[in-house]
Amino acid sequence: MAAKESGEKLVALNKKARHLYEFLEKYEAGLVLMGSEVKSLRLGRISFKDGYVKFQDGEAFMIGVHIAPYENAGYAGHEPERPRKLLLHAAEINAMRVKVEQKGLTVVPVRVYFKNGRAKVEIALARGKKVFDRRDDLKSRDLDRDAARELARH
């Protein structure tokens, strides 16, 4: 048997979420996966395209995240966009659910990684950015980049 991995190994980052949402709180959750999904994740074959977290019967599920089928899975493959259960404490689930219902926030996946050999997802309680907020972010990023370029020249 192979030695256990230590530390974190990043699988994928949801860059679009950072652009579309303002993150208020972040949580780490475990993922309930099938074997072929774990193997596919290790190859980095995941897309967050329209991913979000839905609360149902006191549990949290990640919806709309595409994990590509593992080629060597044979008959034991998985459905690419099935809802995946998140492993969180009940208090965390209830706190997020209340904020989503009352304040009109949403919960989105931010990144997927392996921590000590186990698949984890970082989810964030987020508020959607308005178009002008996104423009302001782009402007400030451009100004920072220009300033750094000028400093490097001199």
Swiss-Prot record:
GO CC, one annotated term: cytosol
Major localization class: cytoplasm
Keywords recorded for this protein, A-Z: Cytoplasm, RNA-binding
Subcellular location: Cytoplasm
Gene Ontology biological process terms, A to Z: trans-translation
One Pfam family of this chain: SmpB
Gene3D superfamilies with a match to the protein in the record: 2.40.280.10
GO molecular function, one term: RNA binding
Family indicated by similarity: Belongs to the SmpB family.
Described purpose of this protein according to its UniProt entry: Required for rescue of stalled ribosomes mediated by trans-translation. Binds to transfer-messenger RNA (tmRNA), required for stable association of tmRNA with ribosomes. tmRNA and SmpB together mimic tRNA shape, replacing the anticodon stem-loop with SmpB. tmRNA is encoded by the ssrA gene; the 2 termini fold to resemble tRNA(Ala) and it encodes a 'tag peptide', a short internal open reading frame. During trans-translation Ala-aminoacylated tmRNA acts like a tRNA, entering the A-site of stalled ribosomes, displacing the stalled mRNA.
Name the UniProt record assigns to this protein: SsrA-binding protein
Designated gene of the protein: smpB
